[in-house]
Regions:
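OB-fold and OB-like single-stranded nucleic-acid-recognition modules
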Residues: 1-121
């Protein structure tokens, strides 16, 4: 298996009380190190890794899974277990073999909190 794509997976859950964006750095294969340049998506937008959350796929939380967005947001304090949704036109979630198990990466435009039950838009 190379990878499995889950097009309907969009949910993430807070695993820390602080949720924040950090820039995704470019990895230089020859130097075997990260350089100061920030990675971009296929549309040229800068990528941000969201720290403090884990992807949820088929009701399973992928601790250590990565969540990446293109819209930066200021750090926020939330209760552990708070659910968010990765939103945007091109949200993807993929699961792949990794050392010692499975890895997971979810990417999209932004992180939003889902509406609460009974809330109207």
């Amino acid at each position: 298996m190379r990878e499995l794509i889950f097009p309907e997976a969009r949910e993430v859950v807070a695993t820390r009380v602080r949720v924040e964006c950090i820039p995704v750095k470019v990895y230089d294969q020859e130097a075997k190190t990260y350089i100061k340049e920030q990675r971009t998506d296929s549309h040229g937008r800068p990528l941000w890794e969201v720290e403090g959350v884990a992807p949820v796929i088929m009701d399973a939380i992928f601790e250590g899974g990565k969540v990446q967005v293109t819209e930066h947001f200021e750090p926020q304090r939330v209760p552990i277990g708070t659910h968010f949704v990765v939103a945007g036109d091109d949200v993807t979630a993929r699961v792949y073999p990794s050392r010692g198990g499975l890895g997971c990466t979810m990417s999209g435009d932004r992180l939003t909190q889902p509406k609460k039950s009974g809330e109207q838009r």
